[in-house]
Amino acid sequence: MDKLIQTLISGLSLGSIYALIALGYTMVYGIAKMLNFAHGDIIMVGAYAVITAVFTMGLPPFIAILISIALCALLGIVIEFLAYRPLRQAQPLAVLITAIGVSYLLQNLALLIYGSEQKAFPMIVALPTVHIGGVYIDGITLATLVVTAVIMVAISLFINKTRMGKAMRAVSEDKEAAELMGISVNRTITVTFAIGSALAGVAAIFYGAAYTYIRPTTGAMPGIKAFTAAVFGGIGSIPGAMLGGILLGVIEQLSKTYISTLWADAIVFGVLVVVLVVKPTGLLGKKISEKV
């Protein structure tokens, strides 16, 4: 029984990281209707920013975190302006190819600057481990869960209650109509990318704290799985991203513990296929009908 509970806790830890990354994915898609497949690599950039700020520049961890989040937000703005804005009216395939290109560009730039060897991630803060019987709960697991839940609520309130949030919803519904109403579509989408990329910076902190080492390809697989989590929960749904991330992490850890680590990824993606066959919009996604 302790083994099962410990596995579920490990799944919550992994899933909360996926959920945090998926929140950025689903926010950008929900507002801009674009899939930023370079999102995972922005996490890698954020992690390297912390490493550089702490070990090279000698800055305190808290300052390094702020720099990392700000850098990720700025990088998101630059990527949107240079790579995605010119393709706003292009076919989805063109946007997809561009996103993959941006992803490889970031990975190779990191490879040139930091080399292929993994770098140790600094300890940001020492969190105590909670022991309950034969089960232990790592402090970083609790912190990630709490922060992810708080961010999910904050984003939901921001989108539904603030002026910019209402502008985002209007742009999501109809860009042309929003522009006619005086809403700056470019500014709204830029802010969306900035917030989504800042969330990637937050995810970088918790990913680095949990796995302690970073390499140029660090963000690739977590990015893909977080995208899977967003689709699983319902792409465009903020609560869906949270639910999808948690469930995906739990399924992956259960697969590794009770089936095989070799089959874990296949099982995760297999479950996604089954969910999409049964409910194409994801667990919390809403079916939208359009008049032609």
Describe these PLM feature segments.
Residues 18-20, 58-70, 193-200, 204-270:
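Transmembrane alpha-helical segments in multi-pass inner-membrane proteins
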Residues 1-21, 49, 60-64, 90-95, ...:
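Membrane-interfacial amphipathic/re-entrant helices at transmembrane-helix boundaries
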